[in-house]
């Protein structure tokens, strides 16, 4: 069971890295909310230790704009590392998937 979960995380991380190279994205709650309000977001990724108020606000705007949400199994440090950044991030909004098939 743990092996399956780990391979699933590796798959998501690989897709995220492909988005970082070939697609367009914004990091952070405020920027993600802006893209959601403008209707430019294709997918939103939320870390599992995102504060509940932020999580609820992002999920609310996702339902309004009919944008899919992916709940990342790692914490915000893991999400930042998967994005290739040296800092933590709770929310990632993908505006252009590029060569990745992460939105499917």
Swiss-Prot record:
Keyword Ubl conjugation: no
Keywords of the record: Ribonucleoprotein, Ribosomal protein
GO CC, one annotated term: ribosome
Record keyword Ribosomal protein present: yes
GO molecular function per UniProt: RNA binding
SUPFAM superfamilies tied to this protein: L30e-like
Gene3D superfamilies given in the database record: 3.30.1330.30
InterPro entries recorded: Ribosomal_eL30-like, Ribosomal_eL30-like_sf, Ribosomal_eL30_CS, Ribosomal_eL8/eL30/eS12/Gad45
Entry's family note: Belongs to the eukaryotic ribosomal protein eL30 family.
UniProt protein name: Large ribosomal subunit protein eL30
Organism field: Leishmania major
Gene that produces this protein: RPL30
């Amino acid at each position: 069971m743990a092996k399956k979960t780990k391979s699933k995380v590796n798959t998501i991380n690989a897709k995220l890295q492909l988005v970082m190279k070939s697609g367009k994205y914004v990091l952070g709650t405020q920027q993600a909310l802006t893209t959601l309000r403008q209707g430019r977001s294709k997918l939103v990724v939320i870390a599992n230790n995102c504060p509940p108020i932020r999580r609820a606000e992002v999920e609310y705007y996702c339902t309004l704009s009919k944008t899919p949400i992916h709940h990342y199994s790692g914490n915000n440090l893991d999400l930042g590392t998967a994005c290739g950044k040296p800092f933590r991030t709770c929310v990632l909004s993908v505006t252009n998937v590029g060569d990745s098939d992460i939105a499917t």
